[in-house]
From Swiss-Prot:
Gene3D superfamilies: 3.30.1240.10, HAD superfamily/HAD-like (3.40.50.1000). Phosphate binds at residues 9, 44-45, 205, 231. This is Putative phosphatase MG125. PANTHER family: HAD SUPERFAMILY HYDROLASE-LIKE, TYPE 3 (PTHR10000:SF8), PHOSPHOSERINE PHOSPHATASE (PTHR10000). InterPro entries: Cof, HAD-like_sf, HAD_sf. The keyword Magnesium applies. Pfam families: Hydrolase_3. Belongs to the HAD-like hydrolase superfamily. Cof family. The keyword ATP-binding does not apply. The active site is at residue 8. Its cofactor is Mg(2+).
Length: 285
């Protein structure tokens, strides 16, 4: 039996068009119908602004809200929705020394840093590193949502740094440099051949799940999670039931309770149906 379902957004709940598709809506509706008390928690690397939009859309699908908690920035912030407004429950900002060291390394290797500021208003992103890539990112993508880094941004606090490289070979090299530089002091995750993400040591989805469970007096044995990438590993280790999407890293699949075998628009709904048919009302140990 489960009381909570933790969901990643990109590559999991959201389709390739960044929406909740009809098969997923139907499967989720059937799951909630089978257990009306079931709650959903969203856990994502996105910003609070982007995450909240999807939380609101998800809640609007049902007669009563199903999402009370969500974490964003890869677990650096946790929110609880009260009176239809998100209330911050914790946050982890990177130490200034970590930020400055990261920016220095990335600039040397001609990569681009996209740092997420602890801010509720735009601009909430700052750019550092390769100036040409930064210019294209600002003027063709984020526009008013981002600015170029200055020392005052350290006072605001930085929740997460996304690092981009055009060269996969260089990205792999810098990933190893960052891992060796920081050791276990921060989370350094390789998301793709061109993307690295850096967060505070305690800023992960596993911590978010555990924190929420203690706050709501829920057992981790009654929680299931679904994800598809490295930043889902921590929550897979915490929850009793974990389900990996078909294109997940092999190490994530190894620790998963089950894995989707679909790569089409049914890849997420297949896992929801599996949960509905097996563990949704199964007796807890």
């Amino acid at each position: 039996m489960i009381d909570l379902l933790g969901l990643d957004l990109d590559g999991t709940l959201l389709s390739k068009t960044k929406k909740i598709n009809n098969p997923s809506k139907l499967a989720l509706t059937n799951l909630i119908a089978k257990k009306p008390s079931l709650k959903v928690m969203i856990l994502t690397g996105r910003s609070v602004f982007s995450t909240l939009k999807h939380v609101e859309k998800l809640n609007s699908l049902f007669k009563k809200p199903i999402v009370d908690y969500f974490c964003c920035y890869g677990g650096a912030k946790l929110y609880q929705i009260e009176a239809n407004k998100p209330q911050e429950r914790y946050k982890f900002c990177l130490e200034n020394s970590v930020v400055e060291t990261t920016f220095s390394i990335i600039k040397k290797h001609r990569g681009l840093c996209l740092a997420y500021l602890d801010s509720y208003v735009s601009p909430y992103l700052c750019l550092a590193g390769n100036k040409l890539l930064g210019w294209f990112t600002k003027y063709f993508w984020y526009r008013k949502r981002c600015v170029f880094f200055n020392q005052n941004h350290l006072k605001q606090g930085i929740l997460k740094i996304s690092v981009y490289f055009l060269s996969a070979k260089r990205c792999k090299k810098v990933y190893e440099i960052l891992k060796n530089t920081f050791q276990e002091k921060v989370n350094v995750l390789s998301f793709s051949n061109n993307l690295i993400e850096i967060t505070h040591h305690d800023a992960n989805k596993g911590y978010a799940i555990e924190y929420m469970a203690k706050r709501e007096q829920l057992s981790l044995n009654r929680i299931a999670v679904i994800g598809d990438s490295w930043n889902d590993y921590a929550m897979f280790k915490k929850a009793k039931y974990s389900f990996a999407m078909s294109k997940s890293p092999s190490q994530l699949k190894l620790i998963a309770t089950n894995t989707s075998n679909k790569t089409n628009r049914y890849r997420f709904s297949t896992l929801l149906n599996l949960i509905s048919e097996t563990i949704i009302n199964q007796k807890a140990d």
